[in-house]
Swiss-Prot record:
GO biological-process terms attached to the record: regulation of lipid metabolic process
Function: Involved in the regulation of lipid metabolism in adipose tissue and liver.
Self-association and partners: May interact with ERFE.
Location relative to the cell: Secreted
Entry GO terms, CC: collagen trimer; extracellular region
UniProt name for this protein: Complement C1q tumor necrosis factor-related protein 2
Species the sequence originates in: Homo sapiens (Human)
C1q domain mapped to chain residues: 145-281
Domain of life per record: Eukaryota
Record field: compositional bias (Basic and acidic residues): 66-78
Bilayer-crossing regions: none
Tissue: Expressed in adipose tissue.
Amino acid composition bias (Low complexity), ranges on this chain: 53-65, 84-120
Coiled coil: none
Name of the gene: C1QTNF2
Length: 285
C-alpha cells in the first residue's frame, strides 16, 4: 500500500518539471527537471488579482425594518383663510364680575322748584366770631421816621428759573431797610403794615405761569401764553403783613417757566414797598 502512495506523490512531482520545461522549451543539460520532493511550506499570499466583471443583479431582498423618524420639516406657508364656521351654541352665564370703579360725576342738573317752607327749628348755638371790620380812618402821618422805611426793587440775571421754588432776583436796584434777601429771593417783613407789591416779567420761547406767594399761599397768579414773540406778564396787589411774614414770586406750573433775561435790552422786575405801618408797631415813633 505504501509504494502506491509514494508513486502517487512522485508522479506529479516528476511530471510538473517536464511539462514546465516543455512549455518553455527549456531542456538545458543538467537541469534538475526530475527532482521530486515533498511539498514545501506555504508561500506568502500573492498580490490581489484584477477585479472581475460585475455579476448579475441579485434578487430583490425582503423589506427592511422601519427607520427612525426624521427631523421635523420647515414650517409650510400659511394656507388661505377658510370660510367662517357656524355660530356655536350660547355658553352658560359666567360668574358675576367685580364692582367697577365709580364713574365721573355727571353734569349739574337744573335748579329744582322751591319747596314749601319748613317748620321753625330750635335756636342754634352761638356762632363764631365775625370777620374783622373795615379799616378805620387813617391816623396821623409819621412820614420821615427812619423806622418805617421799607422798599425794594430787584431784577433777575438768569432765564427759565426752577419751578415751585422762590425766584432769586439777585440784581438789587433798591433795598431800603434791607428787608429783601437776595440769596433766598424772599422779602421778609420788618415793619408790620400795608404793602404794595408788583412785578413785570419778560417771557420768551415758553408760556409763563407765575404767582405771588405770601407765607406759602398764592395770593395772585398770572398766566401768559407764548405767541412766538417776546411778551410781558404783570401783576400787583396790596397785602397786610406782620413781622416776619415772607413774600416771593415762583413758577406754579410745570414747563411754564418762560421767564427770559437779556442783559442788553430787557429786565424782569419784582418791586414792593410799605404804604403805611401799623399804629401799634413798636418801631413806630
Amino acid at each position: 500500500m505504501i509504494p502506491w502512495v509514494l508513486l502517487a506523490c512522485a508522479l506529479p512531482c516528476a511530471a510538473d518539471p517536464l511539462l514546465g520545461a516543455f512549455a518553455r522549451r527549456d531542456f538545458r543539460k543538467g537541469s534538475p527537471q526530475l527532482v521530486c520532493s515533498l511539498p514545501g511550506p506555504q508561500g506568502p499570499p500573492g498580490p490581489p488579482g484584477a477585479p472581475g466583471p460585475s455579476g448579475m443583479m441579485g434578487r430583490m431582498g425582503f423589506p427592511g425594518k422601519d427607520g427612525q423618524d426624521g427631523h421635523d420639516g420647515d414650517r409650510g406657508d400659511s394656507g388661505e383663510e377658510g370660510p367662517p364656521g357656524r355660530t356655536g351654541n350660547r355658553g352658560k352665564p359666567g360668574p358675576k364680575g367685580k364692582a367697577g370703579a365709580i364713574g365721573r360725576a355727571g353734569p349739574r342738573g337744573p335748579k329744582g322748584v322751591n319747596g314749601t317752607p319748613g317748620k321753625h327749628g330750635t335756636p342754634g348755638k352761638k356762632g363764631p366770631k365775625g370777620k374783622k371790620g373795615e379799616p378805620g380812618l387813617p391816623g396821623p402821618c409819621s412820614c420821615g421816621s427812619g423806622h418805617t422805611k421799607s422798599a425794594f426793587s430787584v431784577a433777575v440775571t438768569k432765564s427759565y428759573p426752577r419751578e415751585r421754588l422762590p425766584i432769586k432776583f439777585d440784581k438789587i436796584l433798591m433795598n431800603e431797610g434791607g428787608h429783601y434777601n437776595a440769596s433766598s429771593g424772599k422779602f421778609v417783613c420788618g415793619v408790620p403794615g400795608i404793602y404794595y407789591f408788583t412785578y413785570d416779567i419778560t417771557l420768551a420761547n415758553k408760556h409763563l405761569a407765575i404767582g405771588l406767594v405770601h407765607n406759602g399761599q398764592y395770593r395772585i397768579r398770572t398766566f401768559d401764553a407764548n405767541t412766538g414773540n417776546h411778551d410781558v406778564a404783570s401783576g400787583s396787589t396790596i397785602l397786610a403783613l406782620k413781622q416776619g411774614d415772607e413774600v416771593w414770586l415762583q413758577i406754579f406750573y410745570s414747563e411754564q417757566n418762560g421767564l427770559f433775561y437779556d442783559p442788553y435790552w430787557t429786565d424782569s422786575l419784582f418791586t414792593g414797598f410799605l404804604i403805611y405801618a401799623d399804629q401799634d408797631d413798636p418801631n413806630e415813633v
